Amino acid sequence: AQEYTAAIAGLIAGMPLNRSADNHIMNDLKEVEDYEPKIGKFSLYMDEDIVRVNCGVNSKTTFDSTWKKDTRKIKVVEGMCFIVDDIRDTFKKYWIGNYISDYDNKMNFCSNITKVYFKEMSPNVLNGDYDNKVEIDIEAQKRAIIIDGLETDGMTDLEILQYPTGDEVYLTGDVRFVDTMASLSLTMTM
């Protein structure tokens, strides 16, 4: 198994955004020992005379409200990394030093991500039926205001969002990632 790790890594690295490793045929293998899939274990299985990937999962086995069950799937985590890297790279290449850190420019950056980039990421990475968005992080803005020695209680949300934060840009995102079909539940009645 260990000698095949590089082939699995190559499979994952070369997987297009519109599919996962689930059920992928491993043409270079003739036979594997059947293995009961376990949470956190990437495994292969025999499907008649074909070797297939059982489920493209990583080793994650604990989940919470931030790291949901979907984060065990390699396709989902790859999509997460892809989007975060793209946004950080875009910010670094095109925004740092080129735009004043004010409300309008922060909103323009958010709008570019939400209305252009996220639309391009649907349907292969993000769920196009969900309102995927990035916006100014109001809670981080409040913390910045408090650090400056002011109170936020008497401020409107717009005043909080417009508060100048120097060169810091605090954003938050709400997105839904997509995965491929992997499990079927079928009920038929007559």
Language model features with spans:
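Structured, hydrophobic secondary-structure cores that serve as assembly/anchoring elements
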Residues: 8, 12-24, 28, 33-190
